Amino acid sequence: MKTVTVRDLVVGEGAPKIIVSLMGKTITDVKSEALAYREADFDILEWRVDHFANVTTAESVLEAAGAIREIITDKPLLFTFRSAKEGGEQALTTGQYIALNRAAVDSGLVDMIDLELFTGDDEVKATVGYAHQHNVAVIMSNHDFHKTPAAEEIVQRLRKMQELGADIPKIAVMPQTKADVLTLLTATVEMQERYADRPIITMSMSKTGVISRLAGEVFGSAATFGAVKKASAPGQISVADLRTVLTILHQA
């Protein structure tokens, strides 16, 4: 299975990489959060731009991205607009969403973008191609904050992301029972062992699903999300605790 290298970080080998999310509403908030994150032990910084108030003003978005890059210079920067329908803070039209991601790619400030699987196959394929032309990697994602689909459906979605050109397919689902967590882990193993030719990221959310955030190296998930201050999704734990557990499992 091939790995994905972003800056000097190799995703898909060794312990799962830790992603943290920056969620400031204004440029001032973004700068102060980035400064607070500078000393934290993480691997990838995700900017959740759907939390940013001026998201429809390209100049403001790029100014904020530039400010983040000036403060955190050495970590890969993942640009993510999480749509309202997948648990995000705002809604954009498909045209606005694609234009925003293309502007991020054009800026030269970001290393990765997040593209939601269900944006539309043609739009997704074209944007993946555009990102790759500019040496920007693509995490393709799907989120279900209500339930855990059947393992077969989870695998099917991850395989479709791979077919659409994602560098890293990602899915996050909500467990209603402990068995739902096992469904997610089973799907992860099946995808990783039978179909994946690149790293994948999977997680079962909430307190019930925490084990999935910790045991990625065992089951086949290449990255996990942790919290520096405020969690960006249910079930995230602090980056310090996360690093400790990931290291223990890696060295076992």
From Swiss-Prot:
Its EC number is 4.2.1.10. Pathway: Metabolic intermediate biosynthesis; chorismate biosynthesis; chorismate from D-erythrose 4-phosphate and phosphoenolpyruvate: step 3/7. Keywords: Amino-acid biosynthesis, Aromatic amino acid biosynthesis, Lyase, Schiff base. Disulfide bonds: none annotated. The active site is at H143, K170. The keyword Phosphoprotein does not apply. It catalyses: 3-dehydroquinate = 3-dehydroshikimate + H2O. The keyword Transcription regulation does not apply. Coiled coil: none annotated. 3-dehydroquinate binds at S21, E46, W47, R48, R82, R213, S232, Q236. It is an enzyme of class 4 (lyase). One of its GO terms (molecular function) is 3-dehydroquinate dehydratase activity. Pfam families: DHquinase_I. NCBIfam families: aroD. Involved in the third step of the chorismate pathway, which leads to the biosynthesis of aromatic amino acids. Catalyzes the cis-dehydration of 3-dehydroquinate (DHQ) and introduces the first double bond of the aromatic ring to yield 3-dehydroshikimate. Homodimer. This is 3-dehydroquinate dehydratase. The lineage of its organism: Bacteria, Pseudomonadati, Pseudomonadota, Gammaproteobacteria, Enterobacterales.
